[in-house]
Amino acid sequence: MADIIKQLEQEEIARLGKTIPSFAPGDTVVVGVNVVEGTRKRVQAYEGVVIAIRNRGLNSSFIVRKISSGEGVERTFQTYSPLIASIEVKRRGDVRRSKLYYLRERSGKSARIKEKLQLRAPKETSSAE
């Protein structure tokens, strides 16, 4: 029974055809959200740090936290929601936890996340001697 549900969810994800970049907790992302104001429809950018990811197939979601006017604001996004226009990873964060809820109590410099450095491929040494 569970396999049938899992298969249906995978088919639905494939049908949606959304390209979601790989991101992890600690990454700074910009989420483009479709907002309807009266008759106008526009895309609103929401930039912040991913503090949690919930992997549940079609019901997957993630929480983005940002500081707006000195106040912490968190927003939960459904990963496969039609309201999400785009997800762009701005910066990779180097963290050792999967849930960064401790950032809620932090402010200022202690709430910063170290940037993950990309490992470079080792240089090839030519043995021309």
Curated annotation (Swiss-Prot):
Keyword terms, alphabetized: Ribonucleoprotein, Ribosomal protein
PROSITE patterns: RIBOSOMAL_L19
One term under GO cellular component: cytosolic large ribosomal subunit
Any Pfam family hit: Ribosomal_L19
Single Gene Ontology MF annotation: structural constituent of ribosome
Example GO BP: translation
InterPro entries listed in its UniProt record: Ribosomal_bL19, Ribosomal_bL19_CS, Ribosomal_bL19_sf, Translation_prot_SH3-like_sf
Organism domain of life: Bacteria
Family (UniProt): Belongs to the bacterial ribosomal protein bL19 family.
Stored PANTHER family: LARGE RIBOSOMAL SUBUNIT PROTEIN BL19M (PTHR15680:SF9), RIBOSOMAL PROTEIN L19 (PTHR15680)
Known function: This protein is located at the 30S-50S ribosomal subunit interface and may play a role in the structure and function of the aminoacyl-tRNA binding site.
HAMAP family for this protein: Ribosomal_bL19
Protein name, as recorded: Large ribosomal subunit protein bL19
Organism whose genome encodes this protein: Methylobacillus flagellatus (strain ATCC 51484 / DSM 6875 / VKM B-1610 / KT)
Organism lineage string: Bacteria, Pseudomonadati, Pseudomonadota, Betaproteobacteria, Nitrosomonadales
